[in-house]
Amino acid sequence: MTIKDPLLDLNIVTETSGFYQGFSKFVTVGSKISIGALILWAVTQPETAGQVLKAVRSSIDSNTGPWYMYVMAFYILVCFGLAIWPATGKIRLGGEGSSPEFSNFSWFSMMFGAGIGIGMLTYATGEPIYHFSNNPDVIMGNATASSADNVRAAMKWSFLHWGFSAWGCYAIVGLALAFFSYSRGLPLTIRSGLTPLFGRALEGPLGHIVDIVSVIATILGVSVTLGYGVSQFASGVYNITGMGWLMDVDGDPTKIAMI
Protein backbone atom coordinates (compact mmCIF):
# COMPACT_ATOMS: atom_id res chain seq x y z
CA MET A 1 0.00 0.00 0.00
CA THR A 2 1.47 3.32 -1.07
CA ILE A 3 0.84 6.60 0.69
CA LYS A 4 -0.01 9.47 -1.61
CA ASP A 5 2.05 12.63 -1.44
CA PRO A 6 0.33 15.42 0.50
CA LEU A 7 -1.58 17.99 -1.51
CA LEU A 8 0.43 21.22 -1.51
CA ASP A 9 -1.84 23.36 -3.66
CA LEU A 10 -5.57 23.86 -4.02
CA ASN A 11 -6.81 25.77 -7.04
CA ILE A 12 -9.73 27.87 -5.79
CA VAL A 13 -10.93 30.31 -8.43
CA THR A 14 -10.92 33.87 -7.07
CA GLU A 15 -11.78 37.21 -8.63
CA THR A 16 -8.86 39.16 -10.10
CA SER A 17 -10.52 42.58 -9.95
CA GLY A 18 -13.53 44.42 -8.65
CA PHE A 19 -15.26 44.34 -5.28
CA TYR A 20 -14.58 40.63 -4.73
CA GLN A 21 -10.91 40.75 -5.74
CA GLY A 22 -9.00 37.96 -4.02
CA PHE A 23 -12.18 36.18 -2.89
CA SER A 24 -14.20 33.31 -4.27
CA LYS A 25 -17.30 34.98 -5.67
CA PHE A 26 -19.30 31.77 -5.40
CA VAL A 27 -18.56 31.43 -1.67
CA THR A 28 -18.94 35.13 -0.87
CA VAL A 29 -22.19 35.70 -2.76
CA GLY A 30 -23.59 32.35 -1.65
CA SER A 31 -22.89 33.19 1.99
CA LYS A 32 -24.41 36.66 1.67
CA ILE A 33 -27.58 35.35 0.05
CA SER A 34 -27.99 32.61 2.67
CA ILE A 35 -27.43 34.92 5.65
CA GLY A 36 -29.52 37.68 4.07
CA ALA A 37 -32.44 35.30 3.48
CA LEU A 38 -32.25 34.05 7.06
CA ILE A 39 -32.20 37.60 8.46
CA LEU A 40 -35.08 38.67 6.21
CA TRP A 41 -37.11 35.67 7.34
CA ALA A 42 -36.43 36.43 11.02
CA VAL A 43 -37.35 40.12 10.60
CA THR A 44 -40.51 39.65 8.52
CA GLN A 45 -41.82 36.55 10.30
CA PRO A 46 -40.25 36.59 13.78
CA GLU A 47 -42.79 34.28 15.43
CA THR A 48 -42.64 31.63 12.72
CA ALA A 49 -38.85 31.84 12.51
CA GLY A 50 -38.56 31.58 16.28
CA GLN A 51 -40.80 28.52 16.45
CA VAL A 52 -39.04 26.75 13.59
CA LEU A 53 -35.55 27.48 14.92
CA LYS A 54 -36.53 26.40 18.44
CA ALA A 55 -37.98 23.17 17.06
CA VAL A 56 -34.81 22.50 15.07
CA ARG A 57 -32.63 23.16 18.10
CA SER A 58 -34.78 20.94 20.34
CA SER A 59 -34.54 18.14 17.79
CA ILE A 60 -30.77 18.51 17.56
CA ASP A 61 -30.38 18.60 21.35
CA SER A 62 -32.54 15.53 21.93
CA ASN A 63 -31.07 13.43 19.11
CA THR A 64 -27.38 14.33 19.30
CA GLY A 65 -26.85 15.15 23.00
CA PRO A 66 -24.88 12.00 23.93
CA TRP A 67 -23.02 12.08 20.61
CA TYR A 68 -22.00 15.69 21.33
CA MET A 69 -20.45 14.78 24.68
CA TYR A 70 -18.56 11.80 23.24
CA VAL A 71 -17.22 13.92 20.39
CA MET A 72 -16.01 16.63 22.78
CA ALA A 73 -14.22 13.99 24.87
CA PHE A 74 -12.70 12.58 21.67
CA TYR A 75 -11.36 16.04 20.78
CA ILE A 76 -9.54 16.23 24.12
CA LEU A 77 -7.94 12.82 23.59
CA VAL A 78 -6.88 13.77 20.05
CA CYS A 79 -5.29 17.01 21.26
CA PHE A 80 -3.34 15.23 23.99
CA GLY A 81 -2.35 12.52 21.54
CA LEU A 82 -1.07 15.04 18.99
CA ALA A 83 0.89 16.82 21.72
CA ILE A 84 2.66 13.78 23.19
CA TRP A 85 3.23 11.80 19.97
CA PRO A 86 6.75 12.77 18.84
CA ALA A 87 5.91 12.73 15.12
CA THR A 88 3.25 15.43 15.55
CA GLY A 89 4.28 17.13 18.78
CA LYS A 90 7.47 18.45 17.19
CA ILE A 91 5.83 19.86 14.06
CA ARG A 92 6.45 23.60 13.78
CA LEU A 93 3.47 25.44 12.34
CA GLY A 94 4.72 27.63 9.53
CA GLY A 95 7.51 25.30 8.47
CA GLU A 96 11.03 24.62 9.65
CA GLY A 97 12.90 27.68 10.86
CA SER A 98 9.81 29.83 11.28
CA SER A 99 9.32 31.86 14.46
CA PRO A 100 6.14 33.05 16.23
CA GLU A 101 4.77 36.38 15.06
CA PHE A 102 3.58 37.29 18.57
CA SER A 103 4.82 36.69 22.11
CA ASN A 104 3.36 33.97 24.33
CA PHE A 105 1.48 36.61 26.34
CA SER A 106 -0.08 38.01 23.16
CA TRP A 107 -1.05 34.55 21.95
CA PHE A 108 -2.71 33.64 25.25
CA SER A 109 -4.49 37.00 25.31
CA MET A 110 -5.86 36.45 21.80
CA MET A 111 -6.85 32.87 22.62
CA PHE A 112 -8.85 33.87 25.69
CA GLY A 113 -10.25 36.96 23.98
CA ALA A 114 -11.50 34.94 21.01
CA GLY A 115 -12.29 31.71 22.85
CA ILE A 116 -14.16 33.18 25.81
CA GLY A 117 -14.50 36.88 25.06
CA ILE A 118 -17.62 38.64 26.23
CA GLY A 119 -18.96 35.45 27.79
CA MET A 120 -16.47 35.76 30.66
CA LEU A 121 -18.20 38.97 31.79
CA THR A 122 -21.33 37.26 33.09
CA TYR A 123 -21.28 33.58 32.20
CA ALA A 124 -18.47 32.82 34.67
CA THR A 125 -21.11 33.04 37.40
CA GLY A 126 -24.31 33.09 35.34
CA GLU A 127 -23.97 29.63 33.79
CA PRO A 128 -23.40 27.68 37.04
CA ILE A 129 -26.39 29.51 38.54
CA TYR A 130 -28.51 28.61 35.51
CA HIS A 131 -27.44 24.95 35.63
CA PHE A 132 -28.15 24.92 39.37
CA SER A 133 -31.84 25.21 38.52
CA ASN A 134 -31.87 23.25 35.26
CA ASN A 135 -29.43 20.88 33.56
CA PRO A 136 -29.52 17.45 31.89
CA ASP A 137 -29.18 15.69 35.26
CA VAL A 138 -32.30 17.50 36.49
CA ILE A 139 -34.16 16.69 33.28
CA MET A 140 -33.25 13.00 33.56
CA GLY A 141 -34.24 12.91 37.24
CA ASN A 142 -30.72 12.28 38.58
CA ALA A 143 -30.66 15.53 40.59
CA THR A 144 -33.15 17.90 42.17
CA ALA A 145 -33.28 21.46 40.86
CA SER A 146 -31.92 24.19 43.15
CA SER A 147 -30.83 21.71 45.81
CA ALA A 148 -27.52 20.78 47.40
CA ASP A 149 -27.23 17.57 45.39
CA ASN A 150 -27.35 19.61 42.17
CA VAL A 151 -24.27 21.73 42.88
CA ARG A 152 -21.83 19.18 41.47
CA ALA A 153 -23.98 18.65 38.38
CA ALA A 154 -24.25 22.41 37.79
CA MET A 155 -20.47 22.81 37.85
CA LYS A 156 -20.00 19.67 35.74
CA TRP A 157 -22.10 21.03 32.89
CA SER A 158 -20.49 24.46 33.19
CA PHE A 159 -17.04 22.93 32.82
CA LEU A 160 -18.25 20.94 29.82
CA HIS A 161 -18.97 24.25 28.07
CA TRP A 162 -15.97 26.23 29.32
CA GLY A 163 -13.32 23.69 30.31
CA PHE A 164 -10.94 21.37 28.46
CA SER A 165 -13.69 20.07 26.19
CA ALA A 166 -14.39 23.51 24.74
CA TRP A 167 -10.70 24.26 24.27
CA GLY A 168 -10.20 20.86 22.67
CA CYS A 169 -12.84 21.75 20.08
CA TYR A 170 -11.20 25.12 19.42
CA ALA A 171 -7.76 23.52 19.15
CA ILE A 172 -8.83 20.93 16.57
CA VAL A 173 -10.19 23.60 14.23
CA GLY A 174 -7.30 25.98 14.88
CA LEU A 175 -4.65 23.32 14.30
CA ALA A 176 -6.31 22.17 11.08
CA LEU A 177 -6.42 25.73 9.72
CA ALA A 178 -2.87 26.53 10.82
CA PHE A 179 -1.25 23.29 9.65
CA PHE A 180 -2.78 23.08 6.20
CA SER A 181 -2.40 26.81 5.56
CA TYR A 182 0.99 27.68 7.06
CA SER A 183 2.75 24.32 6.80
CA ARG A 184 1.19 22.92 3.61
CA GLY A 185 0.70 26.26 1.84
CA LEU A 186 -3.01 25.76 1.16
CA PRO A 187 -5.61 28.57 1.31
CA LEU A 188 -6.73 29.63 4.77
CA THR A 189 -10.17 28.01 4.50
CA ILE A 190 -12.03 25.21 6.23
CA ARG A 191 -12.00 23.14 3.04
CA SER A 192 -8.20 22.94 3.18
CA GLY A 193 -8.41 20.84 6.33
CA LEU A 194 -10.46 18.25 4.43
CA THR A 195 -7.97 17.72 1.60
CA PRO A 196 -6.68 14.39 2.99
CA LEU A 197 -10.24 13.05 2.63
CA PHE A 198 -11.51 14.64 -0.58
CA GLY A 199 -8.39 15.89 -2.39
CA ARG A 200 -8.94 18.05 -5.45
CA ALA A 201 -12.69 17.52 -5.33
CA LEU A 202 -12.64 20.46 -2.93
CA GLU A 203 -11.65 22.79 -5.76
CA GLY A 204 -15.21 22.64 -7.08
CA PRO A 205 -18.77 22.82 -5.73
CA LEU A 206 -18.05 20.51 -2.78
CA GLY A 207 -15.39 22.87 -1.46
CA HIS A 208 -17.61 25.90 -2.04
CA ILE A 209 -20.42 24.29 -0.03
CA VAL A 210 -18.03 23.48 2.82
CA ASP A 211 -16.85 27.09 2.99
CA ILE A 212 -20.38 28.53 2.72
CA VAL A 213 -21.59 26.32 5.57
CA SER A 214 -18.53 27.35 7.59
CA VAL A 215 -19.20 31.05 7.03
CA ILE A 216 -22.87 30.68 8.00
CA ALA A 217 -22.01 28.67 11.13
CA THR A 218 -19.38 31.21 12.17
CA ILE A 219 -21.67 34.21 11.70
CA LEU A 220 -24.56 32.57 13.55
CA GLY A 221 -22.30 31.42 16.37
CA VAL A 222 -20.72 34.84 16.86
CA SER A 223 -24.13 36.54 16.60
CA VAL A 224 -25.58 34.39 19.38
CA THR A 225 -22.57 35.04 21.62
CA LEU A 226 -22.66 38.79 21.03
CA GLY A 227 -26.44 38.88 21.45
CA TYR A 228 -26.36 37.13 24.81
CA GLY A 229 -23.34 39.12 25.96
CA VAL A 230 -24.77 42.52 25.05
CA SER A 231 -28.14 41.58 26.53
CA GLN A 232 -26.59 40.63 29.84
CA PHE A 233 -24.34 43.69 29.80
CA ALA A 234 -27.38 45.94 29.33
CA SER A 235 -29.19 44.17 32.17
CA GLY A 236 -26.18 44.61 34.43
CA VAL A 237 -25.86 48.32 33.65
CA TYR A 238 -29.60 48.73 34.31
CA ASN A 239 -29.35 47.02 37.69
CA ILE A 240 -26.44 49.26 38.67
CA THR A 241 -27.61 52.60 37.27
CA GLY A 242 -31.39 52.19 37.08
CA MET A 243 -31.54 53.87 33.64
CA GLY A 244 -35.03 53.01 32.43
CA TRP A 245 -34.32 53.26 28.71
CA LEU A 246 -32.16 50.14 28.92
CA MET A 247 -35.03 47.75 29.75
CA ASP A 248 -38.64 47.43 28.63
CA VAL A 249 -41.69 46.63 30.76
CA ASP A 250 -41.13 42.88 30.30
CA GLY A 251 -37.62 43.08 31.73
CA ASP A 252 -35.88 42.58 28.39
CA PRO A 253 -33.21 44.92 26.97
CA THR A 254 -34.62 47.54 24.61
CA LYS A 255 -33.58 47.75 20.96
CA ILE A 256 -31.69 50.98 21.69
CA ALA A 257 -29.74 49.21 24.44
CA MET A 258 -28.91 46.31 22.12
CA ILE A 259 -27.69 48.69 19.41
Regions found by a protein language model. Name each.
Residues 2-147:
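N-terminal alpha-helical transmembrane segments of multi-pass membrane transport
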Residues 52-62, 144-170, 211-215:
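Membrane-core helix-loop-helix motifs of multi-pass transport proteins
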Residues 51, 228, 232-235:
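Transmembrane-helix terminus/interface motifs of multi-pass secondary transporters
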Residues 89-91, 123, 127, 153, ...:
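Flexible, active-site-adjacent loop/turn segments at secondary-structure boundaries
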Residues 131-150, 232-255:
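Hydrophobic alpha-helical transmembrane segments and immediately flanking/interface helices
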Residues 19-26, 30-43, 76-79, 116-120, ...:
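Helix-loop-helix module between adjacent transmembrane segments
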Residues 84-92, 186-194, 237:
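Membrane-embedded alpha-helical segments and adjacent helix-loop junctions characteristic
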Residues 7-15, 56, 147-154, 166-167, ...:
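Short, mixed-charge, low-aromatic patches
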